[in-house]
């Protein structure tokens, strides 16, 4: 009799994706982040669902409903802080996952990579709208500032902003629609994840060497299921440490003040995971230029396959490119720091230099050094 795992129409899909999937034997812990992102998405959907049972998307009661969740709902504080800090964990895993893809040349799987970029944009949109829902000062002013950026689009900008707001300012209509979008987007993300995996399984996984590994594949289960479970336990440990010991570490104190359209906070800034893009936005004095730089700071990932001039896929054996990659990483940390600083000297010039360096490394230095490495290896 045939094994049900291999014959049942539904179970065999799961079997080919997570059990009998041929996997390169040498993939390192950097390949754990895909499964961790799946776990993060699951945690966010579950905690979000329970929060939505008690939350009210009305300007008069939104802030109070969040307070009610934390004070009166059974384990409400735990659910709320797991959701808020779960978003931070989600982005840490996302950045590491993208960084892994850049380092080991995984962007050469073009369809998988492009779906990944769409996923990154969707997750960022979801997180932004979720931040608005608690209706604190930073939520309100963050929503006002970020949605206002669309007014930089020539001709249709102002109309577009008012259409998104559902009025002439961020108000009840905005909050209600943001709640609607914030609820539906994670399910769209889950669907995109399936497409992402579908394209990945067409080609098979990349590996640290960047070489073809068809001759040395092992089944995903039990080897990588156990490895992923270890990663998951570490993720949960880190998340719960953050939630139970310092849940407000990554939040903004201003968000404990109810939204007030008549009082602007001295420094408007988004959550930490958007600070690098916010720093790039602020580094350009022109509004439209800033918005374009903001979009291209992430969209630039899409042209990485075009800029691959090296004869080796991975950076594993390319010390010059490795050096550049870590300079780029340090530059992103610098941008994140600058994004949280006030707009004054010397932060303005540091932000501008860091932004120039970010685009220069990706567009100029990485391709140039790749060609140089080819020459040095006499290829």
From Swiss-Prot:
The name of this protein is Cytochrome b
**Species per Swiss-Prot/TrEMBL record:** Glis glis (Fat dormouse)
Q: Which residues bind a ubiquinone?
A: 201
Where is the protein found, in the record's own terms? Mitochondrion inner membrane
Q: How is the cofactor bound?
A: Binds 2 heme b groups non-covalently.
Subunit structure as annotated in this protein's UniProt entry = The cytochrome bc1 complex contains 11 subunits: 3 respiratory subunits (MT-CYB, CYC1 and UQCRFS1), 2 core proteins (UQCRC1 and UQCRC2) and 6 low-molecular weight proteins (UQCRH/QCR6, UQCRB/QCR7, UQCRQ/QCR8, UQCR10/QCR9, UQCR11/QCR10 and a cleavage product of UQCRFS1). This cytochrome bc1 complex then forms a dimer.
Matching entries from SUPFAM superfamilies are given as: a domain/subunit of cytochrome bc1 complex (Ubiquinol-cytochrome c reductase), Transmembrane di-heme cytochromes
Q: Which InterPro entries match?
A: Cyt_b/b6_C, Cyt_b/b6_C_sf, Cyt_b/b6_N, Cytb/b6-like_sf, Cytochrome_b, Cytochrome_b_C_euk/bac, Cytochrome_b_N_euk/bac, Di-haem_cyt_TM
CDD domains recorded:
cytochrome_b_C, Cytochrome_b_N
PANTHER family assigned = CYTOCHROME B (PTHR19271:SF16)
Among the record's GO biological process terms, what is one? mitochondrial electron transport, ubiquinol to cytochrome c
Q: Where does heme b b566 bind?
A: 97, 196
Provide the binding site for heme b b562.
83, 182
Which residue ranges run through the membrane?
Answer: 33-53, 77-98, 113-133, 178-198, 226-246, 288-308, 320-340, 347-367
So what does this one do?
Component of the ubiquinol-cytochrome c reductase complex (complex III or cytochrome b-c1 complex) that is part of the mitochondrial respiratory chain. The b-c1 complex mediates electron transfer from ubiquinol to cytochrome c. Contributes to the generation of a proton gradient across the mitochondrial membrane that is then used for ATP synthesis.
Further comment found in the protein's record: Heme 1 (or BL or b562) is low-potential and absorbs at about 562 nm, and heme 2 (or BH or b566) is high-potential and absorbs at about 566 nm.
Q: Which family does it belong to?
A: Belongs to the cytochrome b family.
Q: Which GO terms describe its molecular function?
A: metal ion binding; ubiquinol-cytochrome-c reductase activity
Where does the source fall among the domains of life? Eukaryota
PROSITE patterns noted in UniProt: CYTB_CTER, CYTB_NTER
Q: Name one GO cellular component term.
A: respiratory chain complex III
């Amino acid at each position: 009799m045939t094994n049900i795992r291999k014959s049942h129409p539904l179970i065999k899909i799961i079997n080919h994706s997570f059990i009998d999937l041929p996997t390169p034997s040498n993939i390192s812990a950097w390949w754990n982040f895909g499964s961790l992102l799946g776990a993060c998405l699951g945690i966010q959907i579950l905690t979000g669902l329970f929060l939505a049972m008690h939350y009210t998307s009305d300007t008069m009661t939104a802030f109070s409903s969040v307070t009610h969740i934390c004070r009166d709902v059974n384990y409400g504080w735990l659910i709320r802080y797991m959701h808020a800090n779960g978003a931070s964990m989600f982005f840490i895993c996302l950045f590491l996952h993208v960084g892994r893809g850049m380092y080991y040349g995984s962007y050469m799987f073009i369809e998988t990579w492009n779906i990944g970029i769409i996923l990154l944009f969707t997750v960022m949109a979801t997180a932004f709208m979720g931040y608005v829902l608690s209706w604190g000062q930073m939520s309100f002013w963050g929503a006002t500032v970020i949605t206002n950026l669309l007014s930089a689009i020539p001709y249709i900008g102002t109309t577009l902003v008012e259409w998104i707001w559902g009025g002439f300012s961020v108000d009840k209509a905005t909050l209600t629609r943001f709640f609607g979008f914030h609820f539906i987007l994670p399910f769209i993300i889950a669907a995109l994840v399936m497409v992402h995996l579908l394209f990945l399984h067409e080609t098979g996984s990349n590996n640290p060497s960047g070489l073809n590994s068809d001759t040395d594949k092992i089944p995903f289960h039990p080897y990588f299921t156990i490895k992923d479970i270890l990663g998951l336990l570490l993720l949960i440990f880190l998340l719960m440490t953050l939630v139970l010991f310092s849940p407000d570490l990554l939040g903004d104190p201003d968000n404990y003040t109810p939204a007030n359209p008549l009082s602007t906070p001295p420094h408007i800034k988004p959550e930490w995971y958007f600070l690098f893009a916010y720093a790039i936005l602020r580094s350009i004095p022109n509004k439209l230029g800033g918005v374009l730089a903001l979009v291209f700071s992430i969209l630039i990932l899409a042209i990485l396959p075009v800029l691959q001039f090296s004869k080796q896929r991975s950076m594993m054996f390319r010390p010059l490119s490795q050096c550049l990659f870590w300079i780029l990483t340090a530059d992103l940390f610098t941008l994140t720091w600058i994004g949280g600083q006030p707009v004054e000297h010397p932060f303005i010039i540091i932000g501008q230099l860091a932004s120039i360096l970010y685009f220069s490394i990706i567009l100029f230095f990485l391709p140039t050094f790749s060609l140089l490495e080819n020459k040095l290896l006499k290829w």
